Design a protein with these regions (language model features):
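Nucleotide-activated sugar donor-binding and catalytic core shared by glycosyltransferases
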Residues: 3-135
C-alpha cells in the first residue's frame, strides 16, 4: 500500500505502464510465496522476503543499506544494493542476463528445525529429570 501511494503521490505511474510491472494489493503468505517462486528477480526492502527468496533460490536485490539477515547475503541469493539507482540497474541487468549471484540454501534451513528443537528439548528435559532424581 505504501509503494502504490508513493507512486501516485510522486506521479510515477507512467514509468510502470508498459514495463511488465504489476502493482498488487497486499498478498497472503502462500500467495506471496507462489509469486516469489515464479519470479526471475525480486527487489525488496523487506527482511522476510530476503529469507524467502534465499530458500526458493530466487535472486533478490535488497534496496537497503543493511540487513538483519546477513546469512541471506553471505550464503543466499540476496545482494544489498542500497538506494543507488546505478547499482540497482546494474545488478538487475546481470541477474536478468543470467550472470547474477548464485547462492545456496544455508545448511540449517533444511526443513528439520522442529525435529532438532524437539530433540534438544527432550535431551534437556531428561537432564532436568536426572538432576532432580540425584538430589
Amino acid at each position: 500500500p505504501r509503494t502504490r501511494a508513493n507512486i501516485e503521490r510522486f506521479g510515477l505511474g507512467h514509468h510502470i505502464k508498459g514495463h511488465r510491472l504489476v502493482l498488487l494489493p497486499p498478498q497472503g503468505y502462500l500467495e506471496m510465496v507462489g509469486l516469489l517462486a515464479g519470479a526471475r528477480i525480486v527487489l525488496t526492502d523487506s527482511g522476510g522476503l530476503q529469507e524467502e527468496t534465499t530458500a526458493l533460490g530466487v535472486p533478490c536485490l535488497t534496496l537497503r543499506e543493511n540487513t538483519e539477515r546477513p546469512i541471506t547475503v553471505e550464503q543466499g541469493t540476496n545482494t544489498m544494493v542500497g538506494r543507488d539507482t546505478g547499482a540497482i540497474r546494474s545488478e538487475a541487468a546481470e541477474i536478468l542476463a543470467g550472470r547474477g549471484k548464485h547462492g545456496r540454501v544455508p545448511e540449517l534451513w533444511d526443513g528439520h528445525a522442529a525435529e532438532r528443537i524437539a530433540s534438544d528439548l527432550a535431551e534437556w528435559l531428561v537432564g532436568q529429570h536426572q538432576s532432580r532424581a540425584s538430589t
